[in-house]
Swiss-Prot record:
Protein name (record): Acidic phospholipase A2 DsM-a2/DsM-a2'
Swiss-Prot/TrEMBL GO biological process terms: arachidonate secretion; lipid catabolic process; negative regulation of T cell proliferation; phospholipid metabolic process
Signal peptide: 1-16
InterPro entries with a match to the protein in the record: PLipase_A2 (IPR001211), PLipase_A2_Asp_AS (IPR033112), PLipase_A2_dom (IPR016090), PLipase_A2_dom_sf (IPR036444), PLipase_A2_His_AS (IPR033113)
Cofactor(s) named in the record: Ca(2+)
Protein family membership: Belongs to the phospholipase A2 family. Group II subfamily. D49 sub-subfamily.
CDD domains per the UniProt record, alphabetical: PLA2c (cd00125)
Record-level Gene Ontology MF annotations: calcium ion binding; calcium-dependent phospholipase A2 activity; phospholipid binding; toxin activity
Species this chain originates from: Daboia siamensis (Eastern Russel's viper)
UniProt note on tissues of expression: Expressed by the venom gland.
Enzyme Commission number(s) from the entry: 3.1.1.4
Disulfide-bonded cysteines: C42-C131, C44-C60, C59-C111, C65-C138, C66-C104, C73-C97, C91-C102
Length: 138
């Protein structure tokens, strides 16, 4: 029952199409995306403020900025077309907005993979109240 509660809490705070973004993260890192990256640092999860705490948190900051540039659909709920081909994530479909959201998620998943060595468990479930420094600009 406790595990179910933890997963439910995690589901509330993740931006984007949860399943699709989580699958991309799993594919690129081998980690379960929801539990590994939700509420990590100052930017992973819902919203964000302050300075990214490390390169992993910066991936989330860049992802938030990318979502902020998407026009024509809601990146938080958009369902897009994508596939995995030879270890790569390939965004598809004809809708430019959905492709843009997919690209944001793809780039973030790759960023997590490239920065796995910076992942620090002390930033899991990090309090937003500890994110006091001035925010970087997108």
């Amino acid at each position: 029952m406790r595990t179910l509660w933890i997963v439910a809490v995690c589901l509330i705070g993740v931006e984007g199409n949860l399943y699709q973004f989580g699958e991309m993260i799993n594919q690129k890192t081998g980690n379960f995306g929801l539990l590994s990256y939700v509420y990590y640092g100052c930017y992973c999860g819902w919203g964000g403020k302050g300075k990214p705490q490390d390169a992993t948190d910066r991936c989330c900051f860049v992802h938030d900025c990318c979502y902020g540039r998407v026009k024509g659909c809601d990146p938080k709920t958009a369902t897009y077309s994508y596939s995995f081909e030879n270890g790569d994530i390939v965004c598809g479909g004809d809708d430019p907005c959905l492709r843009a959201v997919c690209e944001c998620d793809r780039v973030a998943a790759i960023c997590f993979r490239e920065n796995m060595n910076t992942y620090d468990k002390k930033y899991m479930l990090y309090s937003i109240f500890d994110c006091k420094e001035e925010s970087d600009q997108c």
